[in-house]
Amino acid sequence: MKATLADKLARADERLEELDALLAQPEVAADMDSYRKLTREHAELSPVVGLYRQYKQVEADQKTAQEMLADADMRELAEAELADGAARITELENELQTALLPRDPNDERNIFLEIRAGTGGDESALFAGNLLRMYTRYAERQRWKVEIVSESPGEVGGYKEVIVRIVGEGAYSRLKFESGGHRVQRVPETESQGRIHTSACTVAVMPEAAEVGEVDINPADLRIDTFRASGAGGQHINKTDSAVRITHLPTGLVVECQDDRSQHRNRAQAMSVLAARLKDREIQAQQASEASTRKSLIGSGDRSDRIRTYNFPQGRITDHRINLTLYKIDAVMDGDLGELLDALAAEHQAAQLATLSGEG
């Protein structure tokens, strides 16, 4: 094991013992904020230290087996123990490296998923609708809840833009690598010559702020406009100015919400989306900085990157970041995203491990 890794683990072991002692003190238990913080740290360190202690035990057993080699009667048993121990040490080293990888603090958060039609006009809007259905179907499989926050329907179906909130355990950790450009190649229903058209949509996956106050928003930086919600023919159309548009002046970010009949609820929802977008900008900047040092294409933070192509005539989906091609487009469009998402997570973890090894 590398010295830097061993030092890190020895410090973690010492810290866990400190935490055990602290958590046993009545005055610590009386301070709920402090107690919660310490128990969270204890829960994070326990699995790592547990593996480290197993590792130290195997090391000690190896030393004993090494000494047994001098005894002719015990040599065969000692050699078998040394072989088993060497394999177990390699296994534990790999597990420890993975356990030490930095955790994304947003992984367990709910998300706002934003899909925008790009090049391709009506066909792009229709594809935005297909993407929303794909993510909704995936969310249903995970037993997550999906609610539309804001929508701007396309002329012939689909969406020019749609924002949904997805509520569920690990939503951000599973879908965070979906941000970027999604390109579709297919023959539109309106195409009489059977020609393949290419169009695109942009997806942004943003972790929901635990509360709006978590993101520093100066009220003086906001322009808030109200207007009447629009509705399709025959639908209820508000007679009051219930729709809300919030403009964040320093960044130019604009959020509109008009899906609720209550101006108050629309305003609260718009503020939540704005907070998520501002938080997302911070994450993008951080990811771009990290990506430039680790040369990783996954989670680079660049929303303009084309990340995936959906080729319907060939039944093919290609993720360009990891050169993965799957010939199961119908299943994927019906929410079968597991194989894609697992491959992206594995590649991201491999990049993190490479960085950790480089530091060592």
From Swiss-Prot:
One of its GO terms (molecular function) is translation release factor activity, codon specific. The modification N5-methylglutamine is found at residue 235. It comes from the Bacteria. SUPFAM superfamilies: Release factor. Residues 285-295 have a biased composition (Polar residues). Keywords: Cytoplasm, Methylation, Protein biosynthesis. It is found in: Cytoplasm. GO terms for cellular component: cytoplasm. Methylated by PrmC. Methylation increases the termination efficiency of RF1. Residues 285-305 are annotated as: Disordered. It holds the Pfam family PCRF. Belongs to the prokaryotic/mitochondrial release factor family. Peptide chain release factor 1 directs the termination of translation in response to the peptide chain termination codons UAG and UAA. PANTHER family: LD18447P (PTHR43804:SF7). This is Peptide chain release factor 1. The lineage of its organism: Bacteria, Pseudomonadati, Pseudomonadota, Betaproteobacteria, Nitrosomonadales.
